[in-house]
Amino acid sequence: GFKAGVKDYRLTYYTPDYETKDTDILAAFRVTPQPGVPAEEAGAAVAAESSTGTWTTVWTDGLTSLDRYKGRCYHIEAVVGEENQYIAYVAYPLDLFEEGSVTNMFTSIVGNVFGFKALRALRLEDLRIPPAYSKTFQGPPHGIQAERDKLNKYGRPLLGCTIKPKLGLSAKNYGRAVYECLRGGLDFTKDDENVNSQPFMRWRDRFLFCAEALYKAQAETGEIKGHYLNATAATCEEMMKRAIFARELGVPIVMHDYLTGGFTANTSLAHYCRDNGLLLHIHRAMHAVIDRQKNHGMHFRVLAKALRMSGGDHIHAGTVVGKLEGEREMTLGFVDLLRDDYIEKDRSRGIFFTQDWVSMPGVLPVASGGIHVWHMPALTEIFGDDSVLQFGGGTLGHPWGNAPGAVANRVALEACVQARNEGRDLAREGNEIIREACSWSPE
């Protein structure tokens, strides 16, 4: 028999000599225990509560193999410069998770444990997704290479623009702004994340006018153009209806808000997009609710990894230079996690584990939010070729109008890429490069 009552988690779930398996999902949590709670107990509590544990011993424990299924806290280190804060490393056996379900992965790992009384705060800093698990996901519908081939655009970042004012335009005027931007030289325009189907502009009207704008600009420029048609909706069925209508119009790309829409809806949409040749642009509305606090919540690099598994071809990833916060090294860390195949552990960039994606397609990071032409050299240098640079106000705020704003962005981008290819230092000579480029303008 066994003794009933509350028992210490660390007896079962703190296993400092555990050797992690290649199939384990590893998590790094930033734990802030309540005063008087030892670090080992707090770390073990996280492992228990996010896997097999409950607060007492139960009869049915005897009917399962805890050793096979329990999460284990296998290492704890104090955070330098913080009082009473620790990084707890937890290993989860692969069998705890449903295959191909980001939803289930998050329900298990971060579902319950964040409200835990013994912890003052808890933050999931990073996850190591083993190939045995990542291989059960489709991942991005197309990925970076397939997208470049579809668009026939190589050797430079892609340019986008969010149509502003984000709410209040009629469908026809909205389409007009789309046309002007694409005609001026942008590759993409974008529905704002809040634009779904409101009284002033229903989704079907918007889709039709945007498609018309797209084809007109395409015919006049001889380039392939796209507009991210936001398919986010109140129900999964309605979302699919919008995506299907977009495909019937023959447009190249649709868009989804993956956090507000939810991972289940997002994964369904990603599967549809791969089956039907649509690219999928992902907006991260609501991410700051989850990732902004330094000691509670989830770091965006975890949300980014989850999106690569669930599926998306573009995702917003901060700018390093614009109006929204994001530290340079950390941002570059998760940008690499999105694009690359194999990413080495590097604590200076916030990467706690080596991540091997084993040929899962990559996601293009999107820089968006308060950036404009003068940021172009910095952006080209920071993000490199495989990115989408999005200027909303930075295009539509041009004193001469939308099309000249688009021209300005395209000229600046081409100038920066050319200068970089000639070996010039964008960080030092950036402003000079932009000035040279605009010296041909009448103003």
Curated annotation (Swiss-Prot):
Alphabetic keyword roster: Calvin cycle, Carbon dioxide fixation, Chloroplast, Disulfide bond, Lyase, Magnesium, Metal-binding, Methylation, Monooxygenase, Oxidoreductase, Photorespiration, Photosynthesis, Plastid
GO BP terms, alphabetized: photorespiration; reductive pentose-phosphate cycle
Enzyme active site: K164, H283
Gene name, Swiss-Prot/TrEMBL: rbcL
N6-carboxylysine: modified positions: K190
Gene3D superfamilies: Ribulose bisphosphate carboxylase, large subunit, C-terminal domain, RuBisCO large subunit, N-terminal domain
Name listed for the protein in its UniProt record: Ribulose bisphosphate carboxylase large chain
Modified sites of kind N6,N6,N6-trimethyllysine: K3
Site (Transition state stabilizer): K323
